[in-house]
């Protein structure tokens, strides 16, 4: 339910701007907000075409305004400059995903540097229990949050725009289908279709290594004719298969409806704040939001630096990896006795159960690793050859999963991003996890070299990223060892319920030396935690040693020692399970 009464206004003339400024000066503001509608999502290459802003007053009257850069460019710039001046006086100035909008304003040389910035996502995180949405926690999406907690119709205008984008994409795609059918093009027999349909095309391009150049010659000719002559220039560079609705930028949609959508974004931001701010106070979590606020501008600056890359190296590596994937698929088909995709989990499980006599219930990596380990240790069957074929089948499956993920998720994506800029850029999410950990879309970027089974290097991420920006000769990688588990151990102490085993993994907790007991608050104890002999309080003759928590989990789960040849590989699974549990994963997802 809305707390404020709202008025909307599009700024179309200088008089509209003057009226807005006069109204601002005549009201007492509780909070303000801003947002941008942009040509795309690239934080450097894209630009805003619509700027919307507003405030809510102490009398709970709210006002939203929008100005269009494409329709009135000079007025729009003047409006943003004037609004920046006014916004600097607000008690709090909000956006939803504020760093993105700050990047957009910087892209048009209208940056905002006020110290009153905040983000509604901070308020959502700190005013709710730390739970994921599937576990009863709040969604972080603005419209998702508003529709759940403020107004059930909050997604109305978004749905209208989504439908318009979907209809536009469908129109382009139907044109391709018609051209293919008129040309008499027939899809390959394995697709079991008499003529090309959109579902056939989608099936073809689901394969991460499939491109338009892999189409049959007649279909390829029609496809490129469609791409070059029927698709607008602003859309051509985004297409790798058929047109998807998310490729249609907002500035190509119905302007009147878009303005309504923009106004309501300000409403949902400020209504969310009105709901959440008193809860934040009641939970005594305001300090957390203040700390997050101080990080906004430094993180924006970090995001805008980007990574210099060796584009030639990437362009050369992509066909190498593609060729190797195709080669390994043939080996996988030979082992399976049929052609199948790595995503056909049910069929793969049937092959493991029947052909190789391996009783697995799923094809997730952990269970397959355990099956391999079991074969090596005790032999599931007495058929030596079949056992090693089974291991080869599982290893090839896992290898292909890695190869295809690297190829599609990273290599092709990077190549696409480099069409718009000469560097790779990442966004940093301050509240992306319920644990409070900072995340980014580069977080899972591979660090190890991608090699063939014979050890031939295919692609090295470290060779992709180049040193730049100063008199440097190397890239330094810094990593805190198991930092979250260390914090979790300390947290159990601070809340008065110490987890003795977890604490002892990292510090001589409830231990002593010749000088006395260990005190985690004592700087001298901390300084000598690892270079002095400490002994357990309950077993004074037994010396304390640090514990590898991930290794301990691995040994317990797989029944192996550190000398086992599989230990290093399986330890990675132990690590994943530990962190999954730390993030609140349910039992079935951890096992």
Map each language-model feature to its residues.
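Extended, well-ordered alpha-helical scaffold/bundle regions in very large, multi-domain proteins
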Residues: 287-393, 582-591
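Core structural elements
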Residues: 233-248, 260-277, 282-309, 345-356, ...
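Conserved catalytic core of nucleic-acid polymerases
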Residues: 245-251, 300, 304, 359, ...
